[in-house]
Each structure stands twice: as C-alpha cells, then as structure tokens.
Amino acid sequence: MADNIILYDWVSFTSKIDSSETIKDLLGLSDVPWQLVKGAHGYRDRWYFESISIHFNGTPEMGVWCEMSGQGCRAFETHGHGEYDAIFSYLIENPDDTNMTRLDVAYDDFQGLLDLTAIAKDTLDHNFVSRFRSWKVEYSDSGTSVYHGSPSSEIRVRIYDKKAERNRTDLDHWVRCEIQMRRDRAFQFIQSDLPLLRRYFAVLNNYLRYIQVDSDDSNIWRASTADHWARFLQTTDSMSIFKKPGVEYNIFRLENFVVRQAGGAIDTYIKLLGIDELMLRLLQRRAEVRLNPKYEELLRERG
C-alpha cells in the first residue's frame, strides 16, 4: 500500500521584472529542451517544457507568466531544483512586481482515510459546515467528485476519485482532497511559516467540516465532527510530507539550487564580506536553526 502524500499540484505566477530567460533560471531549468510555441491570454509567445509554460511578449504591464500544472510540478521537481520555497520567497520579496495567481495543494490518500461515498452523501444531505456558498456533487464514468466553492472563487475544495480518473486498477484506493487557491488567498498561503501539512489542514479546517447533526441543537457550527472526517483530520500529526528520492537525485537538486538559484547572491556576499564571514554566519546558523529534514537525510545517507 502506498504512503499518503501531500504535494503542490499547480503553481502559477506573473512577474513584471523578469524575462522568460530569468524565469527559467528561477526554476533551475535553463538547460532543458524548451519548445517555442504560441502563447495564450494575450501573450504572443510561450516556452513549453513538460507541462511548464512561460508566456511572454504581451503588453509591458503583463510581464511574464509562469504556469506549472500538476505534471509541470512533477517535472520541476525532477529536472529543476525542486525548491518551491525559493520561488515563493522571490514572490514575497517582490510583492509590487510579482503576483501569485494560482496555487493548488493536494492530499493524496491511498490508505482509505477519505471515505468518498460518505463525503458525497453528507454533502447531498447538507451534513457539513462551510464558508462556501456553493457546492456540487458529480457522478460520472470518471468517478465521484465533490466541490465546495465555485470555479471563480479565490479558494475552492475538490474531493474526487483519482483512482477512477486515472483508471488505476492496480490500486485499492486513491482519493484526492485538493485546495485550489487564487490571487490573495494563494499569496497568503505561501507567506505562512507553518510546515506544508499543517498549513494545508489549517486552511481546510477553516473552510470545511463534515458533521454529525444534533437534532437538539439548532446551531450546526457546534455539531461534532463526522467520524469519517475526523479520521482524515487526525493524520495531521503523523504523516511525513517528505518522499525520499535517490541520493544522487538529491545531490543534483542541492547543487542546482545552490549554484543556479542562490549562486549570484552567494558570490556577491563573498565579494562584499569575504568567505570567512560567510562560513562564520553559516556556523552560527547551524547552532540556532534545525536543518531541513531532507538535508539531514542527505547527510546521513552520504555518511
């Protein structure tokens, strides 16, 4: 049985201070075989690589637009530096010249925590409390899908049968609970210092909860959480968000990030303050801040 995972499944942003080439650098994807194709939404041209699009040659106020679908995110993790925080930090540091336009965060359940049949029934029976005005349940040959929020909403929750959509007969269970955020909601999400898993559930808990209706209490917001939903929420303290790739793949990503993404800043720092000052500050940081778990794992595997 596969482990449950949480992942970024759509990343889209614009920049008025970048060219298409500097966006490639930002992603760590300068050396991959991009294809030049027709742009969209007012952009005349677009660089395309494995579901990653960089649109350019629009009007001056449009800047450039980078869009990574779910498959594009996987390509970024495989062929680029894979450091989403590097992208998000850049957007946070340049709020007047960049915009986070869309961000999807998905929880993939392979272990049966998300009971889609119960979720669909409770939705139809209005056994939930929500900040959304609209909801929808769809049944099709691609499986069951439950929506909270409209397609134009700044935030939307979609729970659906990924196993049926992908026709994965080799899996017993694959249900995805996806939070789609746009514009200000997406920007607020990336500004949080919480780990990704805690951020995800903090947003989900704020917008949606399935309940056990109490006929003796007319205030449904006080109702207990439905058992099937509580089982899903209880995973917040136990699930690791890091999926362990191969060591050499990690070394490549580490080098790609340090040299391609942060190389200019490091080089400037050394020229201004010297290599000894840089090493001193890094040693001080090591004593004050715990290393990211993926870097700790890399050090352990390299001996």
Positions of PLM-derived features:
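Structured, helix-rich domain cores that form ligand/interaction pockets
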Residues: 1-249, 257-303
